[in-house]
Amino acid sequence: DEKILLFPSWETGGTHLRSPLARAVWRRHRQFTAAFEDAWLRSGRFEAAFPGELQDVSAGEWRRVVYDSPADYPAVHPQHERRKYLLFQQNAPGPSRLVSFAGFGEYGRSKLRRAQHLTAAGFTPEPEMLAHGFLRRRFVAGSPVGPGEVTAELLETVAAYLAHLYREHAAEPSVSSDTLREMIATNLEEGLGQSWSKDLLDLPSGEWIERGVMLDGRMLAHEWIRSATGYMKVDALDHHDDHFFPGCQDIAWDLAAAAVELNLGNHGRDVLVEHYRSISGDRGIAQRLPFYRIAYLSFRLGYTSLASATLGDSPDARRFVVETRRYIELIERELGSRLVGHRHG
C-alpha cells in the first residue's frame, strides 16, 4: 500500500465515492494534488495568457450571471462542468470574453476547429485563440431559453443546426443500437423500480443508426441563448467525445433531445422534424425518432437519478429530483398505458 500514490485532480477524502471498497481503500493512500488556483491563477501564468479581470463561472456559477433568481436556475452537476472564466477587459462595460478549458494538444485543437466551423455556419460564438488548453471565445450577451419560450425562429435555428451537424460532422458511431437497447433496459428497470418488466417495452431489433454524427449532445433549453442577432448555441464542442452516452451517434438522438428539452407538443415536434428534413434531406428521420426518444429519455432518467443521489442535500440535488420526475412522466406517456398500469396496478 505504501508504494501506491494517488494523483487526483482535486483533493478529497473519498467519502462521495459510490463503491464502499473504493471509499475504504482511498483513505489508505497518500494523495498529491496541485491546485489550479496556485499553479495558474496566483502565479500569474493565466493572466499573462488572458489579460484582464477574471470571474470564475465554473461549477454552475455562470447561472448567477444570466439569471435573476436561483428559482430560475437549471439543474447542474458541478463536477461535470469544465473550468471556465468570464474575462472583463479594460474599458469594457461587461464581460467581453469567455475562457473555458478545451483540452491539451489535439484534444484542444479539435475543439478549436469545431468551434471555427460552427461559427462560420452561424451557430456558435466566435473562437479567438487556444492557449494552455483554454479556448477564448467572444461572450454573447443574451438570455437562455426558458420553459414556454419556444418561437418559430428558434425551431428553425435548431433544425438548421442539426441539419448542419448531419451533413458536415459525420463520424463512426461510438456505440451500437444493441448497446443503446441495453442502456434503455437497465435505466428503466433501475429508475422505475423492480416492478418494471422488459417484456413491456417492445423495442425494435436491428440497427437504428443511419449515419454516425459528432453530436451536440447537450440540447437542453438553456444551452440556447437568445441574443440581439438571433439564437446562438453554447456548449456545443465536445459532448460527442466525453464520458457520457451516446458519443458519436445518429442525429436522431439530438433531434429527440431537442423535442424533449424544448417541451414540444406533437405539433411543435412535427414542425421541427419537417424543418430539419427539408434542410438535411434525411428522409428516414421520422422512422428513427421513436427509438431515439426512448433512448434519450432513458439516459436522462439515469443521469438525473444518479446526480440527485450524489449531490446530497443541495439545491441542485432537489432540481435533479424534479427533472427525474419529469422524465418518468414523459416515459410513461411514451410507452402508454401498459407501463402505467403495470406500475400502479
Task: Give a label for each model feature.
Residues 211-221:
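Catalytic-loop of the protein kinase fold
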